[in-house]
Amino acid sequence: MTFKGFSKKDFKTMQIPGLEARMNGIQTDIQPKFRAVGEELTTYLSAKLGDEMFLHIARHQRRSVNPPESTWLAICHDKRGYKKHPHFQVGLFDNYLFIWLAFIYENEESAKIANRFLKEKKLLADLPDNFAISPDHTEEKTYPVHDGQLKATLERFRDVKKGEFLVGKIYLPDDSHLSPGKDFIKEAEMVLDELIPLYKASLQ
């Protein structure tokens, strides 16, 4: 498909009641956009990193009753799966779109990664002021990257078994960067460029 951007309808899809109905909306309206965006960004990251990257689209197969509050694509160096590894995400809650570098609870190197980020403070200090962090990919709550929550979030990621760390940028439904499609791709590439040094550091 030709990607024309994200619209307010995409966010409303994440408000559809019921598991089956919301999943139908996600599969029909959002996932084709994820595939189009993801293919472009996967190619971009592969070239930037000099390493083949692979696109994954969340399928929410473990859901049996409650509909997913968010949905996303992930880009990772592992073709078989992304959850154990540092990976990039583009996705939606019903009230914002996110572009993250994500370290979720399945990551087996959380202590090493957190300690590196805590020690090498410049890696995160250099991020733009309009970037954000999240301690939990299942929750909507985010914090500005430079508002004082960073150290506590990294320590929780290090010390708590289910701790997570996501860093990147969020966009409200009326943000002008979300469409047309070429503008969103350009914006996403700029965000990824800011996150690549963190990604590389996490793999060392």
Swiss-Prot record:
SUPFAM superfamilies: YktB/PF0168-like. Pfam families: DUF1054. It comes from Listeria monocytogenes serotype 4b (strain CLIP80459). Belongs to the UPF0637 family. This is UPF0637 protein Lm4b_01081.
